[in-house]
Amino acid sequence: MRSLPTVHTEFSELVAPTKRGRRFMLPMRPGFSDCAPGGRMRLDAIAGWLQDIAYADVEDAGLAQVAAWVVRRTRIRVHRWPRFSERFAVTTYVSGLGRMWAERRTDIVRDGAGAPDVEAVSLWIHLDRIEWHPTTLTDGEIAAYGGAAPERRISARLRHPPPAGAESAAWMFRATELDIAAHINNAAYWQPFEQELLTGDDPEQIDVEIEYRKPALPGEKQVLRDGPHRWIVGEGGEMHASIAVAGDSPGPPPAS
């Protein structure tokens, strides 16, 4: 099994659901384009599931036209990799609220299994649909989602450190990775780390967190690497995202 240095700083908590409050589930299966050559589901594909079920939940609640949501941070903890064509129940629920943001938990549970193969938690920023500026949650949104975690207040503060003395490698974001917001979709930011994973044997498990900063456009970027940390930066040095590997996660081999 491969390993790499890991960080032991604070990661977003994986909060269990309460007995009350809204939960939303969809059946899902990893397809051909979701999986690595060995058959496991890739992290960028898992991130795609997270955003898809988040929107499906908002739409099902009748709130899709109230606001736009953009992801600020996501932690993905893989206990067992989902594999090609397996069937899963993907369940999501709100696990915390802030004034202009909310935290959403998602569990990916294989058919016939009791515990999740994957646990994830994301921080989403609440934006108005015209100017795309942060705005306070509406009474209707709080009524729909507040019951899941009415007393758990969360912060939108980012935690990952800035780069210092890191190795650098080129990366290219493509125009085909733009989404309807006209910037690189959040799932694509996982691809540089996934490319490292694909250089060797698949890790059995992983626990990794990404923070999104300045939205990226297509073009050449740099991926900085220092132990358990990765940073995706633009040509002018602006930071687009940072990645940290938690605990004792296996991962890519050290850079040669």
Predicted regions and their residues:
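Generic structural motif
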Residues: 90-92, 168, 208, 223-224
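Hot-dog-fold acyl-thioester-processing enzymes
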Residues: 2-72, 119-121, 126-206, 253-256
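HotDog/MaoC-like acyl-thioester-processing domains
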Residues: 2-10, 21, 73-161, 212-219, ...
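A conserved acidic, glycine/proline-rich C-terminal tail/linker
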Residues: 196-224
